[in-house]
A protein has these predicted regions:
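Residue-level detector of alpha-helix initiation sites
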Residues: 26, 197-198
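Active-site entrance/lid segments in N-terminal catalytic domains of soluble metabolic enzymes
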Residues: 1-188
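Conserved donor-binding loops in enzymes that form glycosidic bonds
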Residues: 22, 195-196
C-alpha cells in the first residue's frame, strides 16, 4: 500500500490517509489535536458568528490562533463559505494563518453542485487573493452529486463526496457515498469519500480505487476526545444505522440531514428549528443522552465501544 500512502502525503502530508470530516460543533480543538498526534489529518469547525450582513470574524481568528499555537502548524481543514470572500477580516485570516486546507461549503438551501462550484465563487476566490492559497494550500469543494463538465472543477485540489449514508447534511440524493464516488472518480483527480466509513476494509477499498484519503466523522465523534458527553456516547453505543432519520433542515429549502434523535419530540419537518437544528445539536452533544439529536452516518454500525482517537485510527488502518 506504499503507493496509497505516497498519494495521501502529496495532498495531506499525514502519516495515515484518514481525514476528519468537518463536524458541526464536534470538530473541536481537543479532537483535532488528538487526530493530528495520532497521524491523521484534523479538521476544525472554525467559523465566524452573526448574519450575512454583520459577520464577526474575531471568534474564528482567535480559535485558529489557539489551535495553531497548540498544534505547532496550520495543517488543518477549515470550512470556507462564499459570503466571506468580500470581507477584509476574513482575508486577514487567510494571509495571517496560511491554513493548509480550505473546504468550500454551500451555505444556502440550494444543494445544487453547480452552485457550490460556480464561476462566481471561483472568480471571487481569485479576485480576493484566495487563489494564492494554491501555492501552499489545498482548496476542496463539497459535492452531493457528481459533476462532470463544470469549467472550474479543475481548479480544485480535491472534492469531498457525501451520500445518503453519511451523517449531517446529505442533500436530497439517494446515492450512497460509494455510488457517488464511483461516478466522480472519473471526472476529478482527487475524490475523498465522506461518510458511512467505519471499517478497515472500506478504507482499504477506497484507497485502492484511487482516493487519496477517506473522511471519517461518526467514529471520531464517538472517541474519548470528542465533545460529546460520556452519557451521550453510552446512549449512541445502543444505536445503529436503522435509527438514523433523514430530517429537513428548513421548511423552505432542500437541505436534508441524517441524524439520530435522542428526543422523540423533535420536529423533523423543518418547522421548529433555528439554523438547521443547531439548538437540537447543541442539546444532544452536551446533554445526558435524552435530549436533542446527534448528526450521524452509517459508520455508527462499526462503533462497538468508546475508543481513543489513536485506537480508532489504528483500527481503521489495520489492513493497510
Amino acid at each position: 500500500m506504499q503507493v496509497v500512502v505516497d498519494n495521501n502525503q502529496k495532498l495531506f502530508n499525514s502519516k495515515w490517509p484518514i481525514v476528519e470530516a468537518i463536524m458541526n460543533q464536534a470538530s473541536t480543538k481537543k479532537l483535532a489535536l488528538a487526530i493530528s498526534e495520532a497521524g491523521g489529518f484534523p479538521s476544525l469547525c472554525a467559523a465566524p458568528v452573526g448574519t450575512a450582513s454583520s459577520i464577526d470574524f474575531d471568534p474564528m481568528y482567535f480559535e485558529l490562533c489557539d489551535f495553531i499555537k497548540a498544534n505547532g502548524s496550520a495543517n488543518v481543514v477549515v470550512p470556507l463559505s462564499v459570503e466571506w470572500l468580500s470581507q477584509k477580516n476574513f482575508l486577514k485570516i487567510v494571509k495571517d494563518f496560511k491554513i493548509s486546507h480550505w473546504e468550500i461549503f454551500p451555505r444556502d438551501t440550494n444543494t445544487n453542485t453547480q452552485r457550490c462550484l460556480s464561476e462566481v465563487l471561483m472568480d471571487n476566490l481569485i479576485y480576493h487573493g484566495v487563489k494564492f492559497l494554491q501555492r501552499y494550500s489545498c482548496v476542496m469543494g463539497r459535492l452531493f452529486n457528481p459533476v462532470k463538465n463544470h469549467p472550474r472543477l479543475s481548479i480544485l485540489d480535491a472534492v469531498t463526496i457525501k451520500g445518503s449514508d453519511g451523517g449531517g447534511a446529505t442533500g436530497i440524493g439517494i446515492h450512497t457515498v460509494q455510488e457517488t464516488f464511483n461516478q466522480q472518480i472519473n471526472y476529478s483527480k482527487n475524490v475523498i469519500p465522506y461518510g458511512g466509513i467505519g471499517s478497515p476494509h472500506q478504507v482499504k477499498n477506497y484507497l485502492q480505487q484511487g482516493a487519496p484519503a477517506v473522511g471519517v466523522g461518526t467514529l471520531f465523534a464517538m472517541c474519548v476526545e470528542s465533545p460529546l458527553t460520556h452519557d451521550v456516547k453510552l446512549q449512541m453505543l445502543n444505536k445503529s444505522s436503522t435509527d438514523i432519520i433523514n430530517i429537513k433542515g428548513s421548511t423552505n429549502g432542500s437541505l436534508r440531514q441524517n441524524a439520530i434523535l435522542l428526543n422523540s419530540n423533535i420536529k423533523t419537518d423543518g418547522t421548529d428549528n433555528k439554523g438547521n437544528h443547531t439548538d437540537d445539536l447543541t442539546a444532544g452533544i452536551h446533554g445526558n443522552g435524552t435530549q436533542g439529536l446527534i448528526f450521524a452516518g452509517h459508520g455508527i454500525d462499526y462503533v462497538t465501544k468508546i475508543r481513543t482517537v489513536r485506537e480508532t485510527i489504528e483500527y481503521l488502518t489495520s489492513e493497510l
